[in-house]
C-alpha cells in the first residue's frame, strides 16, 4: 500500500466503521490526465447503490476536511464485485470452500497462477483444489509466495 492510500485509509476507516461497511480496497491512480480515488466497500449481505452513495457522501466530507490529495480527483465508491480481492487474513479465512484465483511470485508445479476451491488456510500456507487437465489436484501454496489473491467465478 502506498503512503497516500495508507493516509486515506486512516481518514476514511472511522467513517466506514460508523456505517458498518468493510473497507475492501483503496486505489489511487492516474489515467491520462485524470486522477481517480477508487474505494471498494462491502457489508454482510453485500452493498447496493444506496450504500455506495451514502459512503461516497460521507467519505467526500472527511476527505474535503483533511485534504490529503493535492490534485483534483474523481471519487468512485463501489462494491468489490464477484471477483473481489483477498487482502486480509480474515478475508482469506472467510474464503475457505469458495473459488479463488491466486497469482504467485514463483511457480509451484510449473505454474504461477492457480484457480480452484480454497480448501484450508494456516499461518504458513493455503491449500487449493485445482483442476489440472482431467483431474482435481490439491496444491499447497506457501503464503509468502502469494503475490495476489481474489475470489473467482468458476464456470
Curated annotation (Swiss-Prot):
User: Per the record, what is one GO cellular component?
Assistant: cytosol
Set out the biological process GO terms recorded for this chain's protein.
ribosomal small subunit assembly; translation
Location in the cell reads: Cytoplasm
The UniProt keywords, alphabetically, are:
Cytoplasm, Ribosome biogenesis
Q: Which HAMAP family match?
A: RimP
- Family according to the record: Belongs to the RimP family.
This one is known as: Ribosome maturation factor RimP
Organism of this sequence: Staphylococcus carnosus (strain TM300)
Amino acid at each position: 500500500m502506498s503512503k497516500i492510500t495508507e493516509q486515506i485509509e486512516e481518514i476514511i476507516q472511522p467513517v466506514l466503521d460508523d456505517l458498518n461497511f468493510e473497507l475492501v480496497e483503496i486505489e489511487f491512480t492516474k489515467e491520462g490526465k485524470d486522477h481517480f480515488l477508487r474505494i471498494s466497500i462491502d457489508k454482510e449481505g453485500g452493498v447496493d447503490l444506496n450504500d455506495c452513495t451514502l459512503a461516497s457522501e460521507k467519505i467526500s466530507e472527511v476527505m474535503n476536511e483533511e485534504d490529503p490529495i493535492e490534485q483534483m480527483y474523481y471519487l468512485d465508491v463501489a462494491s468489490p464485485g464477484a471477483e473481489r480481492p483477498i487482502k486480509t487474513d480474515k478475508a482469506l479465512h472467510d474464503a475457505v470452500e469458495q473459488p479463488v484465483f491466486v497469482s504467485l511470485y514463483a511457480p509451484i508445479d510449473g505454474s504461477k497462477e492457480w484457480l480452484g476451491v480454497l480448501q484450508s488456510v494456516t499461518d504458513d500456507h493455503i491449500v487449493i483444489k485445482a483442476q489440472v487437465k482431467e483431474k482435481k489436484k490439491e496444491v499447497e501454496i506457501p503464503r509468502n509466495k502469494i503475490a495476489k489473491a481474489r475470489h473467482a467465478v468458476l464456470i
